[in-house]
Design a protein with these regions (language model features):
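Generic structural signal for buried aliphatic residues
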Residues: 66, 72-73, 291, 299
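A generic secondary-structure signal for well-formed alpha-helical elements
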Residues: 73-76, 201
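Buried, small/hydrophobic-residue-enriched core segments of structured protein domains
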Residues: 81, 95-440
């Protein structure tokens, strides 16, 4: 872009420079190339991934044949929202946990995927669609769970109209993938997805960028906002706080670029397409890179031949908010990365108080002189350096949370179950990922 275009772009956007936060620089970032095809032997839908489901009801049973997009379960509290199979095949197992909690529905895939066929719309047809028809298509097809509502980060309630919708076009988590590499090839689907979700609100649709993503994903007709700063600047909750805060009685929705792509493919191609590109990252990965896969695939199909050592933590998602799944687990519904780091089951002499040169420290309490090499990457393990401790008023939480919220007092009010104080201290604006750095 020319200097004049850059100045115009700056003036036409909301710009936020966030100083609070902390970038955890880890070894093992993915190079921008796609690895060999993964032979995906099995898949699973995990209701525990689907935020806000409290009473899942199965629609299929072991031995049932499926197509990609066949409804498998729904939540009794929102019976019209369907959760669908990512592939065609046969249900081979239903895994339950304590008190018969539904944990996984495992699927043996066909060699060639067969899809449930939905109505195909031209771009002219899309322009004339009504909100009710859009919602019905999204709910019955399996695409609706990509839309998340604030407060509390649940799957959106289709009976509520949000005051605005937000999409973050960058991820600031440790070792996060490049959205330019993941999604720039699907820009047309993203534009169609935006047309669709624009019909779901009377308010504005906000596209939130950093300096790397705004050139690729700045789309006219929507609010394009620019965020700069350390993690959690890429969290949509932080962005909502600065653009359109959630107060008592407010509802705001968010989705992701992948969610927009799924919506675009549904309306243009008439299918529920769960294919995605993810990155395999971490200091224990031989060659960190990107891979094409389908949501919910068995992680062992990829990681068994990719790890350097056996004693590792395999995480579906990022190291701050992902879930430890082991090498027999499955990729989470919302995850676009698999992180592998050393297991922290070894004890070191004097523990965290031992002065060393190779540790990352926010407070410079250890990791002597680490502040002299701010761009150094570290191989961190999962060791928490001790047991659970009481809150100590150090002021650190406030330094890593770029929001007008007092996290220490909010956490204490949550522990005390003081609902009035929670409301006053901003509980409606937060979900777990927004305060994950406080636990680092």
């Amino acid at each position: 872009l020319s200097p004049i275009e850059l100045i115009f772009q700056y003036l036409m956007s909301l710009n936020f420079n966030l100083r609070k936060g902390f970038d955890i620089k880890l070894k093992g970032r993915a190079v921008e190339e796609t690895g060999d095809h993964i032979k995906q032997s099995s898949f699973a839908i995990k209701p525990t991934d689907l935020i806000g489901i409290t009473r899942p009801k199965l629609l299929r049973h072991i031995g049932d044949e499926l197509k990609a997009g066949t409804p498998i379960l729904f939540d009794k509290l929102s019976e019209n929202v369907m959760y669908c199979s990512p592939v065609s095949g046969e249900i081979i197992d239903i895994v339950r946990g304590e008190k018969r909690t539904l944990e996984e529905i495992r699927i043996l895939p066909d060699k060639n995927i067969k899809y449930v066929k939905h109505k195909i719309f031209s771009e002219e047809d899309i322009n004339t669609l009504e909100r009710v028809e859009v919602i019905n298509c999204l709910m019955t097809s399996g695409v609706w769970p990509n839309i998340i509502q604030r407060p509390f980060g649940f799957v959106a309630d289709p009976d509520v109209k949000p005051k605005s919708i937000h999409i973050s076009f960058f991820d600031s988590h440790p070792l996060a993938p490049s959205f330019n590499f993941l999604y720039s090839k699907d820009l047309n689907y993203i534009k169609v997805g935006l047309k669709i979700i624009n019909k779901l609100t009377d308010g504005k649709v906000h596209l939130n960028h950093n300096r790397k993503s705004i050139d690729s994903f700045k789309i006219d007709g929507y609010e394009n906002n620019l965020f700069n700063g350390p993690h959690p600047a890429g969290n949509v909750g932080v962005q909502i706080h600065h653009i359109d805060p959630v107060n008592k009685g407010d509802v705001v929705w968010s989705t992701t670029p992948f969610g927009l792509i799924q919506i675009g493919k549904l309306f243009l191609n008439g299918i529920y397409d769960a294919s995605k590109t993810i990155c395999l990252v971490g200091s224990e990965v031989k060659t960190p890179k990107y891979y094409d896969c389908i949501s919910g695939f068995s992680i062992s199909d990829l990681v068994n031949s990719s790890v350097k050592n056996e004693n590792v933590r395999i995480i579906s998602g990022n190291v701050l908010t992902g879930k430890s799944v082991g090498n027999e687990g499955y990729l989470g519904f919302y995850d676009n990365m698999i992180s592998i780091i050393p297991e922290g089951d070894k004890h070191s002499f004097l523990g965290w108080i031992m002065p060393v040169m190779n540790k990352l420290s926010f407070q410079r309490a250890f990791g002597l002189l680490s502040f002299l090499t701010p761009n150094k990457e570290y191989s961190l393990d999962t060791n928490t350096n001790g047991e659970l401790r009481a809150f100590v008023q150090t002021g650190v939480f406030e330094k890593v949370l770029p929001m007008d919220i007092l996290p220490n007092y909010l956490f204490k009010s949550i522990l005390a179950q003081d609902y009035d104080e929670m409301e006053e201290l901003g509980i409606y604006e937060l979900v777990e990922e927004d305060v994950a750095l406080c636990e680092f």
